[in-house]
Protein backbone atom coordinates (compact mmCIF):
# COMPACT_ATOMS: atom_id res chain seq x y z
CA UNK A 1 0.00 0.00 0.00
CA UNK A 2 1.39 3.39 -1.00
CA UNK A 3 1.72 6.31 1.39
CA UNK A 4 -1.18 8.00 -0.41
CA UNK A 5 -3.38 4.91 -0.02
CA UNK A 6 -2.50 4.60 3.68
CA UNK A 7 -3.38 8.26 4.24
CA UNK A 8 -6.68 7.82 2.40
CA UNK A 9 -7.51 4.73 4.50
CA UNK A 10 -6.75 6.60 7.73
CA UNK A 11 -9.03 9.45 6.68
CA UNK A 12 -11.87 7.02 5.92
CA UNK A 13 -11.39 5.17 9.22
CA UNK A 14 -11.33 8.42 11.22
CA UNK A 15 -14.46 9.63 9.41
CA UNK A 16 -16.37 6.39 10.08
CA UNK A 17 -15.25 6.35 13.72
CA UNK A 18 -16.44 9.93 14.23
CA UNK A 19 -19.77 9.27 12.50
CA UNK A 20 -20.41 6.32 14.80
CA UNK A 21 -19.56 8.49 17.81
CA UNK A 22 -21.89 11.22 16.53
CA UNK A 23 -24.73 8.72 16.03
CA UNK A 24 -24.27 7.45 19.60
CA UNK A 25 -24.15 10.98 21.01
CA UNK A 26 -27.33 11.93 19.11
CA UNK A 27 -29.20 8.84 20.31
CA UNK A 28 -29.36 7.02 16.98
CA UNK A 29 -27.77 4.11 18.83
CA UNK A 30 -28.59 4.17 22.54
CA UNK A 31 -26.93 2.53 25.54
CA UNK A 32 -27.39 -1.23 25.40
CA UNK A 33 -28.59 -1.14 21.77
CA UNK A 34 -27.00 -3.30 19.08
CA UNK A 35 -25.36 -1.41 16.21
CA UNK A 36 -25.74 -2.61 12.59
CA UNK A 37 -23.60 -5.49 11.33
CA UNK A 38 -20.29 -4.87 9.58
CA UNK A 39 -21.91 -5.57 6.21
CA UNK A 40 -24.72 -3.10 6.92
CA UNK A 41 -22.24 -0.44 8.02
CA UNK A 42 -20.13 -1.04 4.90
CA UNK A 43 -23.20 -0.29 2.78
CA UNK A 44 -24.29 2.63 4.96
CA UNK A 45 -20.90 4.37 4.88
CA UNK A 46 -19.74 3.04 1.49
CA UNK A 47 -16.41 1.82 2.83
CA UNK A 48 -14.57 -1.50 3.07
CA UNK A 49 -15.05 -4.04 5.85
CA UNK A 50 -11.43 -3.47 6.96
CA UNK A 51 -12.24 0.20 7.60
CA UNK A 52 -15.42 -0.64 9.52
CA UNK A 53 -13.67 -3.32 11.55
CA UNK A 54 -10.86 -0.96 12.58
CA UNK A 55 -13.30 1.79 13.58
CA UNK A 56 -15.35 -0.66 15.67
CA UNK A 57 -12.25 -2.22 17.27
CA UNK A 58 -11.02 1.20 18.34
CA UNK A 59 -14.39 2.09 19.88
CA UNK A 60 -14.43 -1.25 21.72
CA UNK A 61 -10.93 -0.52 23.05
CA UNK A 62 -12.13 2.92 24.17
CA UNK A 63 -15.07 1.39 26.04
CA UNK A 64 -17.69 2.99 23.78
CA UNK A 65 -18.82 -0.31 22.25
CA UNK A 66 -18.80 -3.86 23.57
CA UNK A 67 -18.71 -7.12 21.59
CA UNK A 68 -20.85 -10.02 22.78
CA UNK A 69 -19.78 -13.29 21.25
CA UNK A 70 -22.48 -14.77 19.08
CA UNK A 71 -24.75 -11.73 19.55
CA UNK A 72 -23.09 -8.71 17.95
CA UNK A 73 -21.70 -5.33 18.95
CA UNK A 74 -23.58 -3.06 21.36
CA UNK A 75 -23.29 0.47 22.71
CA UNK A 76 -21.65 0.29 26.11
CA UNK A 77 -23.74 1.59 28.99
CA UNK A 78 -22.28 4.57 30.84
CA UNK A 79 -20.42 3.61 33.98
CA UNK A 80 -22.02 4.42 37.30
CA UNK A 81 -19.87 5.68 40.15
CA UNK A 82 -20.52 3.97 43.45
CA UNK A 83 -18.76 5.37 46.51
CA UNK A 84 -17.81 2.48 48.76
CA UNK A 85 -18.20 4.50 51.92
CA UNK A 86 -21.80 5.42 51.19
CA UNK A 87 -24.25 3.82 53.61
CA UNK A 88 -27.62 4.04 51.91
CA UNK A 89 -30.26 1.94 50.23
CA UNK A 90 -30.62 1.48 46.49
CA UNK A 91 -33.44 4.02 46.23
CA UNK A 92 -31.25 6.72 47.79
CA UNK A 93 -28.40 5.65 45.53
CA UNK A 94 -30.62 6.18 42.47
CA UNK A 95 -31.64 9.63 43.70
CA UNK A 96 -27.97 10.56 44.14
CA UNK A 97 -27.36 9.55 40.53
CA UNK A 98 -30.43 11.42 39.25
CA UNK A 99 -31.83 8.18 37.82
CA UNK A 100 -34.96 6.08 38.24
CA UNK A 101 -34.77 2.77 40.08
CA UNK A 102 -36.70 -0.46 39.86
CA UNK A 103 -36.32 -3.93 41.31
CA UNK A 104 -37.41 -7.43 40.41
CA UNK A 105 -37.58 -10.13 43.08
CA UNK A 106 -36.19 -13.40 41.76
CA UNK A 107 -36.10 -15.31 45.04
CA UNK A 108 -37.54 -14.90 48.55
CA UNK A 109 -37.74 -17.59 51.21
CA UNK A 110 -37.08 -18.45 54.83
CA UNK A 111 -33.83 -20.39 55.25
CA UNK A 112 -31.65 -21.61 58.09
CA UNK A 113 -29.55 -18.96 59.78
CA UNK A 114 -26.69 -21.42 60.40
CA UNK A 115 -24.35 -20.09 57.65
CA UNK A 116 -24.85 -16.50 58.88
CA UNK A 117 -25.27 -16.84 62.66
CA UNK A 118 -21.72 -15.72 63.49
CA UNK A 119 -21.87 -12.61 61.30
CA UNK A 120 -25.36 -11.70 62.50
CA UNK A 121 -24.74 -12.73 66.11
CA UNK A 122 -27.91 -14.85 66.26
CA UNK A 123 -28.65 -18.49 67.22
CA UNK A 124 -27.79 -21.05 64.56
CA UNK A 125 -31.17 -22.76 64.91
CA UNK A 126 -33.10 -19.59 63.96
CA UNK A 127 -34.20 -18.47 60.49
CA UNK A 128 -33.30 -15.66 58.13
CA UNK A 129 -35.29 -14.15 55.29
CA UNK A 130 -33.39 -14.57 52.02
CA UNK A 131 -34.29 -11.86 49.51
CA UNK A 132 -32.68 -11.85 46.06
CA UNK A 133 -33.43 -8.98 43.68
CA UNK A 134 -32.26 -7.59 40.36
CA UNK A 135 -31.82 -3.84 40.75
CA UNK A 136 -32.40 -1.65 37.70
CA UNK A 137 -31.08 1.85 37.09
CA UNK A 138 -32.94 3.67 34.30
CA UNK A 139 -34.40 0.30 33.22
CA UNK A 140 -30.97 -1.35 32.84
CA UNK A 141 -29.92 -4.18 35.19
CA UNK A 142 -27.10 -2.97 37.41
CA UNK A 143 -26.91 -5.27 40.45
CA UNK A 144 -28.06 -8.61 41.72
CA UNK A 145 -28.53 -8.14 45.46
CA UNK A 146 -28.95 -11.09 47.83
CA UNK A 147 -29.74 -10.21 51.45
CA UNK A 148 -30.21 -12.36 54.55
CA UNK A 149 -32.29 -10.71 57.29
CA UNK A 150 -32.57 -12.28 60.79
CA UNK A 151 -36.22 -13.02 61.57
CA UNK A 152 -35.46 -13.40 65.27
CA UNK A 153 -34.61 -9.71 65.31
CA UNK A 154 -37.12 -8.56 62.68
CA UNK A 155 -40.17 -10.84 63.06
CA UNK A 156 -42.35 -11.38 59.98
CA UNK A 157 -40.13 -9.16 57.83
CA UNK A 158 -40.85 -11.54 54.94
CA UNK A 159 -44.58 -10.84 55.31
CA UNK A 160 -44.17 -7.07 55.66
CA UNK A 161 -41.90 -6.73 52.64
CA UNK A 162 -43.51 -6.23 49.23
CA UNK A 163 -41.69 -5.93 45.92
CA UNK A 164 -40.58 -2.37 45.26
CA UNK A 165 -40.45 -1.28 48.89
CA UNK A 166 -37.22 -0.03 50.46
CA UNK A 167 -35.86 -2.50 53.01
CA UNK A 168 -34.00 0.29 54.80
CA UNK A 169 -37.22 2.29 55.16
CA UNK A 170 -38.97 -0.79 56.55
CA UNK A 171 -36.19 -1.27 59.10
CA UNK A 172 -36.62 2.31 60.26
CA UNK A 173 -40.42 2.61 60.15
CA UNK A 174 -41.37 -0.83 61.52
CA UNK A 175 -38.44 -1.68 63.79
CA UNK A 176 -36.91 1.68 64.70
CA UNK A 177 -33.65 0.51 63.17
CA UNK A 178 -31.37 2.83 61.23
CA UNK A 179 -28.52 1.41 59.16
CA UNK A 180 -25.64 3.73 60.02
CA UNK A 181 -22.54 1.77 59.05
CA UNK A 182 -21.38 -1.31 57.21
CA UNK A 183 -18.35 -3.44 56.50
CA UNK A 184 -17.67 -4.35 52.88
CA UNK A 185 -15.26 -6.71 51.17
CA UNK A 186 -14.75 -6.83 47.41
CA UNK A 187 -13.51 -9.51 45.06
CA UNK A 188 -13.90 -10.52 41.44
CA UNK A 189 -16.36 -13.26 40.53
CA UNK A 190 -17.06 -14.93 37.16
CA UNK A 191 -20.71 -14.59 36.12
CA UNK A 192 -22.72 -17.79 36.41
CA UNK A 193 -25.35 -18.67 33.84
CA UNK A 194 -28.28 -17.29 35.93
CA UNK A 195 -26.32 -14.12 36.72
CA UNK A 196 -25.44 -13.64 33.05
CA UNK A 197 -29.12 -13.98 32.18
CA UNK A 198 -30.30 -11.36 34.69
CA UNK A 199 -27.44 -8.91 34.13
CA UNK A 200 -27.51 -9.37 30.34
CA UNK A 201 -23.82 -10.19 30.15
CA UNK A 202 -21.60 -13.01 28.95
CA UNK A 203 -21.18 -16.25 30.91
CA UNK A 204 -17.93 -15.92 32.86
CA UNK A 205 -17.77 -12.13 32.49
CA UNK A 206 -15.99 -10.46 35.45
CA UNK A 207 -18.34 -9.21 38.16
CA UNK A 208 -17.61 -7.22 41.28
CA UNK A 209 -18.81 -9.20 44.30
CA UNK A 210 -19.39 -6.87 47.23
CA UNK A 211 -20.05 -8.71 50.49
CA UNK A 212 -21.51 -6.57 53.25
CA UNK A 213 -22.54 -6.63 56.90
CA UNK A 214 -24.78 -3.68 57.81
CA UNK A 215 -24.95 -2.31 61.37
CA UNK A 216 -27.59 -0.26 63.20
CA UNK A 217 -27.32 2.73 65.54
CA UNK A 218 -26.42 0.36 68.39
CA UNK A 219 -23.70 -1.35 66.34
CA UNK A 220 -25.77 -4.52 66.00
CA UNK A 221 -25.78 -6.44 62.68
CA UNK A 222 -28.92 -5.73 60.66
CA UNK A 223 -28.34 -7.99 57.67
CA UNK A 224 -25.66 -9.56 55.50
CA UNK A 225 -25.70 -9.27 51.74
CA UNK A 226 -23.86 -10.07 48.54
CA UNK A 227 -24.10 -7.71 45.61
CA UNK A 228 -22.97 -8.71 42.11
CA UNK A 229 -22.45 -6.07 39.42
CA UNK A 230 -20.74 -6.01 36.05
CA UNK A 231 -17.19 -4.70 36.39
CA UNK A 232 -17.54 -2.68 33.17
CA UNK A 233 -20.72 -0.98 34.38
CA UNK A 234 -19.56 0.54 37.63
CA UNK A 235 -16.63 2.49 39.00
CA UNK A 236 -15.93 1.89 42.68
CA UNK A 237 -14.36 4.75 44.61
CA UNK A 238 -12.79 4.75 48.06
CA UNK A 239 -12.49 7.98 50.05
CA UNK A 240 -9.90 7.95 52.81
CA UNK A 241 -9.46 10.68 55.40
CA UNK A 242 -6.59 11.00 57.81
CA UNK A 243 -7.66 11.71 61.39
Curated annotation (Swiss-Prot):
Please report the name of this protein according to its UniProt entry.
Answer: Probable fructoselysine utilization operon transcriptional repressor
Q: What the protein does? A: May regulate the transcription of the frlABCDR operon, involved in the utilization of fructoselysine and psicoselysine.
Among CDD domains, the record links this protein to:
WHTH_GntR (cd07377)
Q: Which organism does this record belong to?
A: Shigella flexneri
Q: What are the protein's UniProt keywords? A: DNA-binding, Repressor, Transcription, Transcription regulation
Q: In which pathway does it act?
A: Carbohydrate metabolism; fructoselysine degradation [regulation]
Family annotation (InterPro entries)? Bact_HTH_transcr_reg, Chorismate_lyase_/UTRA_dom_sf, Tscrpt_reg_HTH_GntR, UTRA, WH-like_DNA-bd_sf, WH_DNA-bd_sf
NCBIfam families this protein is in?
A: PRK11402.1
- According to the entry, every stretch annotated as the HTH gntR-type domain falls at 10-78
**Its gene?**
frlR
